[in-house]
Design a protein with these regions (language model features):
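Glycine-rich P-loop/Walker A and Walker A-like loops and their local beta1-loop-alpha1 context
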Residues: 1-43, 48-50
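A short, well-structured beta->alpha microelement
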Residues: 3-7, 51-98
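Structural motif
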Residues: 21-25, 48-53, 88-95, 112-115
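Short amphipathic alpha-helical interface segments
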Residues: 160-192
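Short amphipathic alpha-helical interaction segments
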Residues: 196-210
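A short, conserved structural fragment
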Residues: 210-220
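Flexible loop/N-cap segments at domain edges
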Residues: 222-225
Length: 225
């Protein structure tokens, strides 16, 4: 039984064409197959191109009916995808496979890749950067949004973030984008005034964000991961 982070998956379906910059191979497999499971709720079939073998234990994310509608291959060569409804690619490096896919008009396209040298070549795709926040917890980052998921085995589980903690992250992000950095003590004072919280509450929120890997503390200064 897979618990799907529905908010993020629904957002990805709305965006349709997304690149995930993620160096985490196992995470890419589990999340990619969980995304395929979500897409197969309304698509007849999906093509998945994965450069390495997928363990049967990970394929257990899908039921028998879903597996029959998921076409898996290590390469796009000799595969007719001109009429494909959806494609998921899990790559360990930049290869011609990806650029061939980009030339085809595919409605739902999701690519997992560790890095991209030529981001301008994929200007029509939304880019999410995936960062490991703490053990089993990953962040999906864009300039505007930040999602959290937890992977346990083959399960993708929602990670809820307290509202005040989310506000702390937003405030720190705005300050860093404007000034570059801020002392931890100054940020606590700022949050006390801006959010009308007691000092102890602000300190606890900052510590919580640090423990989750959302905020980094170094030399008395705070930065985002």
């Amino acid at each position: 039984m897979v618990t799907v982070f529905m908010v993020l998956f629904d957002e990805l379906v709305r965006l349709k064409r997304v690149v995930f910059l993620s160096p985490y191979a196992n995470f890419n497999l589990v999340f990619g197959l969980s995304l395929a499971k979500h897409l197969l709720k309304f698509l007849h079939s999906i093509y998945m191109f994965c450069e390495f073998d997928i363990p049967s234990s990970v394929l257990s994310i899908l039921d028998e009916s879903e597996i029959k509608r998921l076409y898996i291959s290590k390469t796009v060569h000799n595969v007719n995808i001109s009429n494909a409804e959806g494609v998921i690619m899990i790559l360990d490096k930049e290869v011609n496979n990806m650029y061939r896919i980009l030339r085809i008009d595919i409605k739902y396209l999701f690519i997992f890749i560790p890095r991209l040298k030529l981001i301008k070549d994929i200007h029509d795709l939304i880019i999410y950067r995936v960062r490991k926040a703490s053990t089993g917890i990953y962040q999906f980052l864009t300039k505007e949004r930040r999602y959290f998921v937890k992977v346990i085995g083959t399960q993708v589980i929602e990670v809820s973030i307290p509202h005040n903690l989310e506000l702390i992250v937003v405030e720190l992000n705005d300050i860093i984008n404007t000034f570059g950095s801020i002392k931890a003590s100054d940020f606590v004072k700022y949050c006390m005034h801006k959010m009308n919280l007691r000092r102890e509450e602000c300190v606890d929120l900052v510590r919580k964000a640090i423990s989750m890997g959302i905020i980094k503390y170094r030399g008395g200064y705070l930065t985002l991961t």
